[in-house]
Swiss-Prot record:
The keyword Cytoplasm does not apply. It is a multi-pass membrane protein. This is Fosfomycin resistance protein AbaF. GO terms for molecular function: transmembrane transporter activity. One of its GO terms (cellular component) is plasma membrane. The chain crosses the membrane at residues 19-39, 49-69, 83-103, 106-126, 150-170, 179-199, 239-259, 275-295, 304-324, 330-350, 369-389, 397-417. Belongs to the major facilitator superfamily. Keywords: Antibiotic resistance, Cell inner membrane, Cell membrane, Membrane, Transmembrane, Transmembrane helix, Transport. PANTHER family: SHIKIMATE TRANSPORTER. The keyword Transmembrane helix applies. Pfam families: MFS_1. The gene is abaF.
Amino acid sequence: MTTTLKKVVAASMVGSVAEWYEFFLYGTASALVFGELFFQQTGNAIDGILAAFALYAVGFLARPLGGLVFGHYGDKIGRKKLLQISLIIVGITTFLMGCIPTFHQIGYWAPTLLVILRLIQGFAFGGEWGGAVILVSEHSPDDRRGYWASWPQTGVPLGNLVATLVLLLLSKNLSPEQFLDWGWRCAFWFSAVVVLIGLWIRKNVDDAEVFKEAQAKQQLLEKQQLGIIEVLKYHKKSVIAGIGARFAENILYYMVVTFSISYLKLVVHKDTSQILLLMFGAHLIHFFIIPFMGHLSDIFGRKPIYLIGAVLTAFWGFVGFPLMDTGNDWLIMLAIVLGLFIESMTYSPYSALMTELFPTHIRYTALSFCYQVAPIMAGSLAPLIALTLLKEFNSSIPISLYLVAASLISIVSILLVKETKGRSLAFKD
């Protein structure tokens, strides 16, 4: 591993850490405090959480637009510059979320301000993942790309670990009333520290040579198409596969990490500190699983690992929820880790697979579009759908069947594309 690659990996990871710190923070706050603080009370605790989860989904709506804008300019002027801008916007909006007054103080302005900040933040998030993954992939050797390109994905458990640790420290040292009143806000304000560290790390990295060469070739062309038009015109099958392939991973992840918090609180009756402690342990294990699965994709190929993970997704609900229902901490931990292990089989190879499917001059646009469109139909709605099914049927079986449907979509999608392991990133440039 060269010094340059080390810097690039660190620079790509830090944005992902900031992104997932906020997302786990918001998902946890939705389940624990937002329903009570920012929405009119109906007397039913589930209704408030449903409203918070609906707003959780709103943040995903702006992501595809952000992906297109950041992707277009990232393909034209460079990955690094756009990654810096996205990180700054993420930091500002997350900090401001911690400043919003409650529904009791300003009425409907509270959820309105939350919606506005979620949309702006979602726009910035739209350009983060694609740029980070591409930055690493374009610096990586062809035969080890699965491993190195999976490292930005470890920002997911790392961000969640930091968020869980912050929330755990706050909930352990504050009374429930103090945590509800002001403690949760400190967690959002802490995001500024994460972002400042990220900006400092990213200032010393540069775009890869494969991008600079492709950029020079494109500048010689008399007429260039808008990136997304070229993506949709010449790469339809890859786009469909890229979007559909995320359903199993995306829905399973939000089921295991976000919805399970509500499930453990409402059905299993675990307290906040217990849930956060279990999540902390699971995220720590998840951090090591992700690069391992990326390494396996370098050995066996992207598709075999992906397909096994997609198939296993169909079975998690029938195993995971009964394990949680026991109320035993070790079995609950097993359910969460099992879900994250399966999710990693589809999440880890995705970055290398998608990078290898598209040519350099439209890669940022294509990756960001596929990655950000999928959650609108998948993960963004997963906690809301799961909680609604739980409310209507008072059973985890319908939720498990929902996971089966997601699994089938991803299996069909991944079968649409050819194996890409070992492919040069200059293959179409």
